[in-house]
Every structure is written in structure tokens, then in C-alpha cells.
Amino acid sequence: MKKILLSISMLALAYTASANVPVIKSDPKIEAQVEQTLKKLTLEEKIGQMMELVTDLFGANDKNGVFYIDEHKTDSILSRYKIGSILNAPNTCAPTAKQWEKYIAQIQKISMKRIGIPCVFGLDQNHGSTYTQGGTLFPQNINVAATFNREIARRSAEATAYETRAVSVPWTYSPTVDLGRDARWPRIWENFGEDCYLSSEMGKAMVYGFQGEDPNNIDQYHIATSMKHFMGYGVPWTGKDRTPAYISPADLREKHFAPFLAGLQAGALTVMVNSASVNGMPMHANKDILTGWLKEETGWDGVLITDWADINNLYTREMVAKDKKDALRIAINAGIDMIMEPYSCDACGYLIELVKEGKIPMSRIDDACRRVLRMKYRLDLFKNPTQKLKNYPKFGGEEFAKLALEGATESMVLLKNEGNILPLQHGKKILLTGPNANQMRCLDGGWSYTWQGHRADEFAGKYNTIYEAFCNEYGKENVILNQGVTYNEKGKYWEENEPQIQGAVDAAKNVDVIVACIGENSYTETPGNLTDLWLSENQRNLVKELAKTGKPVVLVLNEGRPRLIADIEPLAQGIIDILIPGNMGGDALVGLVSGKSNFSGKMPYTYPKEINSLANYDFKKSEEVGTMEGAYDYNAKITQQWGFGYGLSYTSYKYSNLKVSQSDFRHGDIIKVSVDVKNTGKVAGKESVLLFSSDLIASMVPDGRRLRAFDKVELQPGETKTMTFELKADDLAFVDWNGKWRLEEGDFKLMIADQSADIHCTDTYQWPTANR
């Protein structure tokens, strides 16, 4: 009995110790400044720091439609409500850098005068300077994932931070680390795909890129991050944005929480909350998750912010509150620190009433305000609320453009290359067709100059569309543009004009090869919902008719999610998935098609083949039921068009000599895994080396395989390099039925390409803490 009691006591002590080790180390100087400021504030001023309004409320448009700051209106709002934060571009459209500099200087001057506390501005800089004209647009996050290159992620975030701080904005609502595990969901392209490890690594790299190494001292070239959308947002049961998700408790902890935990451990200063519900509980009302998992278990002292007006959803849609005041009570007590209430200050009055009525404790208001003030001190906003654009000479320059091109090039995935149709030789006549052949909007996607990205062609005119890039490389006289199908730019993202397929077919008679650029127009969030995952019938008919000409067809997929193309895939000799590569996407594609560059991207998600087979790569063996005999003769095979991690190259690679440092292991061990990779082709290339594991027998149904490590290597023809990974034995653990992390005794298999090794765990270990 004494031994049992001792074990229980030690488990409790271990849990307490773990919970009290904060993911961000406290800075005594900053904490003293925060407390000194906090004690000077009235209740109204504290609540004001918890509020975030949209920029539009602080100004108006002149007769030419150009936004300006109305200093009288700004003074009135800040004097009365003591607002602590402002978001979004005016008119939801990118101003120039000079305009941003002026807007924020005007507001900060009034804020410091009226409150003595600077506002903190936030923007959705989701793939570069998305809300500043003249800034750099990088590939979308799904492309970053396809590179399997952490340095691309980090350097892109560093450049984004530089250009964002250049216009005096110190905060971005990025990176998005939801797991895109439902192909129907309209925001897959905003995050890093379906795998929690890949998402964790890329998200962590971006946090370091945005913020730097020290979250307590963020310099003038870095900005605060907001990891989003916490959590379970990416797997709505309907596939539609902001609708409920149903996730097993084990998957919620093991997979969906993982990227957020990695970001917190990297020092992320803020987190944005999932707009919808998970397992019947709206996330904005879930105290167990928001306060328990996110704050108390990790010791995290950052800011938890709502998404757009989401507290209102608690009474208008989720029906867990009777009115707005009740919704505020629920959300703030659940752990919300900042309220994104874009167009209304009503919450200020309600919060004051709730505190005076004892329905929200003053300690909760102090905690929320303290967190906001802490972020502002960490950003050094009290001393430097604004920056000077002239001090940022690299803004919108060649250095960042080259980085955007590099990222786009490494992200594109070669899916098919029959008969070595690619690279396309010079001197050939090429037909460029399809709705994505001559639009910057399609290359940039949503969150590009505007929310839906619908004005990208207006702002990105100096960059090359796919057609323009082909003309530059192959000569305009050798490239014919006849799109056959076009988008209705005045309609919904999915609307197309009356097809002119015969015109494209006629044009194909005079060419050697057809390049069909198909996919989706730009969209984001709820406007991007769909009812059918198949690529549009018009576009598929275009490909079918062109294939009848007998000319070879290369498909270029330019889409935010994997639209089904099973009926036209066999008709193409070459297929390239460029995802959403940004302003340099046209040039990157042509560099690859011409052979000047080599493909190295790999699929960051599973590309489905059938509408009823949307499984992820880590599906469990029990999800795939083979044919049975007799009365129960049926087949439940999981089909895929292309698997996670799939991608071809102009060269070939041979893997050999897989070694592990130990065949037996236990909790706490580090297993060294090495493999030789040789470039056996005739051109140089980069190869992403992926290490997977399989738990062969477990007390809960195990995943078929899981990604555990990856790295990218560059090899010259004939060159061999040894890749070495240090695999933590604890990474082979899983979350069990009781919600506890558990590493079980038993057999495992490690796999890299066609190489494998068997290893054995000698002892079972269960963690006493919520997180490993």
C-alpha cells in the first residue's frame, strides 16, 4: 500500500511540476512594467484593452474613395472606450506602405495621448504582405508544406515580419495550423496539410521566423504571431466552413493539439480560437480547452483572441447563451482575453455590468488585460509604437522576390510524366488553355490584397501569369492562348462563363502540346464552401475534348483543395499540381516545365480519387475492409489518386543501407536512424526524405503509419549522402482511451521509401502529465 501511495504522490508531483513550467519564460522587467501599468487602469480602461475594432471605424473615404483617418472620430472612440487593438485594412483592401505609415501614426498619437497605451494593430498577413500594396506575396501555406523545407517556412515568415513591421503593424494572424484532414473544407490551402507532425514543424518554423528567438524581446524587424484556429477547425463534419466538428478525444489531444503546442513551445504570443464547435461544445465557450489545455497545462501567458465577431455566435447560432451579455459572460470566463468585435463597442458596457454583478470576477479581467499589456511590452510598443518605412530598404525588393520564387519552385509537385513529356523542349508550339492560364488571382488565392483575393490582377500587374511566363520563355510566337473555359469574375468563385471549348479544340490543331491550366478561382472561408468536390464539368469536358485531338496534354492543377479529376487523369501525359504559389508562381512553373529547375515538391495531403473515399494517409487498417466471401461479399477499399508525400522528379533516387542505432528501446531513448540516398539520374535534384513509423499491435487501434521525421537533401548526379535522424522513442507514443499519453511494449516498423527496419519497445510507460 505504501508503494502505491508513493507512486500516486510522485505522479501528482510530476504533473504539478510539468504544469508549472511555462512555455515562455517570464521576464521580471516586463512583468514589473505590466503590473505598474495595470494598477493605474480603471475597470473601463482594462476592458478597453480587451477590445479590438476594425480600422474602418476610425475614418472614412474621401470623394475619390481613398480612406483617411478621421481624427475627431478616432479621438472620440479612444477617449470613450479606451480601445486596445485595431485590425484589418481599410475597406478590406490593401493600402500602400506610405498610407499605412500615416494611418497608424495618426492613431497611435491619439491613443498615447488619451490612454497612454499604444494600440496593437493586427493583419492577416497569411502569405506575405497580403494587405500592403508593393509588398511580397509568398506561396500559400499549403505550398510551404509541399516543400518539406523548414528553412523556406522560416525565411518566408522572417521576410513577412520585416515587411509588416515596416508599415508599423506588429502583429499577424498567422500561421494557420489547423489540420486540413477533410478535402472538402475551403481553408485547406491556408494551413500545412493533413499531418500533425508536418504542421507542427512548419508552424514552429514560422513562429521563429515571425517573432525571432526571444518572445520577450521582439525587435523592430519581427512581429507577434497568432496561431489559429484553436482547435479542430479543419475537420467540419459537413466539410463547410465554421460548422461543427466531431473528433475523438484521443485525436484531439494527439493530433489537433500538437501543432499548437509546438507553436507555444516556440514562443507564440497569441492564439486565435476556432469559430465553430467541437463535440457539441463551442470552442469559445470551452473552459476546459481554452483555460485548461492551452493556459494551465502549459503555463502559457499569451493572449487568446476570438475570431471575427465569434462571441455573438454563442447566442445567434450555437444557442448556448440567451443574449450577447450572456455570451460575453461565458466566453470571458472560458478564457478569452481579447474580443474581435469589429464594428461595435457594446461589449464594453456589458462587461462592466457583468463585473459589477459578480458574474465575471475582477481577477479574470485583470488576467486578460495583463496578457494584452504583456504582449505590447514584449513588442516594445510603449517606446516605439510606430516605425519609419525608410528604415526598411528591403521592403518589396529583389531579395524577397527571389525567396518567393524559390519557395514556389520547391512547392510544385510533379504527379505524372508519361513518356518524359516534361520538360517541354524549346521550339514546340504550345496551346495554353483553361480558366487559370492567364489570371494572377488564381495564382495568389484568398488573402491577397483583399479578403477573397478578387482584385489580385489589379494589384499584381507587374508579375507574370502562366501565359505571360510561357511567352517569356518559349516566345510569344510559339504560345497560343485560348482558354475555352473562363471564370465569371463578377460572380461567385465557382461560377464560369459559357464555355467556348470548340475554339480551344480548333486552336489545338496547330500546336505540338496542350497545357491545360485548370482548378479553382480564389476564395476563402465560408464563400469557398462547395457541394461537389469534382472539378467543374466545364473544365473536365474541356480536357476530354482536347484529348480527342491526339495532341499530348499536360494538366496544371491550380487549386486550393484537391478537386476530383479521376475521369480526366488517364487522358493526360503530364500532371503538375502547383497549388496556390503566389505572385512568382508563373515564373516558377515555367522554370520547372522548361527544365531549368527540377521538381522537388511532395503532396502535403492525400489526393482523393472518389467522393466517398476521403481517408487521410494515416488511416487505420480497420478502415479498409477487403472482399469477403458468401452472402457478405463486399469491398471497402480506400482509393487514392495520389498519396501523402508523393512527388516525382526529372531525376531518380535510390535508397539503401537503412540503419538504426538500437533495435530495443524504452521511454526516454533516442534512436538514431540513417539511410543512404543516391541521385541515380542525369540531373541535379532535391529530395525530401520522409521517415514513417507503424505501431504493429497496440491496446487501441493504431494508425497505419505516421510521419516521424523529414529533411531535404540536394544531390548532384551520381552523388550519395547519408541522412541521419534522431527519433525520440517517446514520439512513438499515442493517446489512449483515458486521454493519457502511452508508449506501449511491442513491435514497431520504421520506413523510409522502400527501406524498413523492425524495432521493439521493451517496457510500457504512461505519462502522468497531460502532455509529453
Which ranges hold each PLM region?
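Short beta-strand elements
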Residues: A757-R772
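Bacterial Sec-dependent N-terminal signal peptides
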Residues: M1-V23
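Glycoside hydrolase catalytic-domain context in secreted enzymes
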Residues: Y15-D736, R742-S756, R772
